[in-house]
């Protein structure tokens, strides 16, 4: 059976326990992962997501995934250079460890300065964003535009590595578009420059988040490198994580969009990797209770700005249950914390009656 066929079957018909039988070495998923001087006791990572992975979101993920690597939202090195005080997105709670701050820019000197400030804030590693596909980032020479500037990318890694005493890692994509998939050579240059881990999203910049992640390219990069390679893209379940590792041979997986409105995902995968058992999924009432807590925490942490940001998070929680669409629409328009809590209280009561 070819790998593409296996991937389809693994996601559709195989249980997590039967997937263990298909893996050449499932026990490796429970072993620590060494990233330079940093030892990770989980092979599941929560992706940095702009406007999402703030301190509040990370606390929720950490609750269910006690050992997974967490990341801040990506931070502009230029912004850090010009501001007298560090932006709130760089705030770290020591209880979050292991934690990394992700930076983006195209200027090696600014990146080195920002990396030093990140470490001073408590970051246990520094991640360099070379994959963001958003125009406002790429037009400034950051994110995935660095895939077209390998010499600059290499210089950034070398300069940051020389500036800090923690592991320096990179998150990137396959290439700019299908005509410029240069990831194997690009990844080798990053490794030679001193990067100590590479996270690879299996799509090009042109794809954005469309189509399926091409895990076969992650497998090619894994075979070409000696540093750890983390697979990213389409990790929406325990089953997907297992299928991805089986196909790619990667050293771990990074969850991104699968965690939106579902901060349980990283913990579910982490639990399975360590025990071989699938954790019971939260009920609708439990998910909505988590949403309610998310709302309250955002309000306490950010005030009115947190309330506005909460709308999208609350909407993400509302899926896969009767009445979800209507509740999502209502929550997206709330103007007070109490309004949101009342709507969620009603939905939680209804969900409990349906158990």
Curated annotation (Swiss-Prot):
First-level EC class: oxidoreductase
One Pfam family, short name: Dus
Gene Ontology molecular function: flavin adenine dinucleotide binding; tRNA binding; tRNA dihydrouridine synthase activity
Keyword flag Transferase: no
Catalytic reaction list: a 5,6-dihydrouridine in tRNA + NAD(+) = a uridine in tRNA + NADH + H(+); a 5,6-dihydrouridine in tRNA + NADP(+) = a uridine in tRNA + NADPH + H(+)
Active site positions: 132 (proton donor)
Binding locations of FMN: 48-50, 102, 171, 232-234, 256-257
EC number(s) stated in the UniProt entry for this protein: 1.3.1.-
UniProt cofactor(s): FMN
Keywords: Flavoprotein, FMN, NADP, Oxidoreductase, RNA-binding, tRNA processing, tRNA-binding
InterPro entries named among the record's database cross-references: Aldolase_TIM (IPR013785), DUS-like_FMN-bd (IPR035587), DUS_fam (IPR001269), DusB-like (IPR004652), tRNA-dHydroUridine_Synthase_C (IPR024036), tRNA_hU_synthase_CS (IPR018517)
Functional summary from the UniProt entry: Catalyzes the synthesis of 5,6-dihydrouridine (D), a modified base found in the D-loop of most tRNAs, via the reduction of the C5-C6 double bond in target uridines.
UniProt similarity note: Belongs to the Dus family.
The protein's name in its UniProt record: Probable tRNA-dihydrouridine synthase 1
Organism: Synechocystis sp. (strain ATCC 27184 / PCC 6803 / Kazusa)
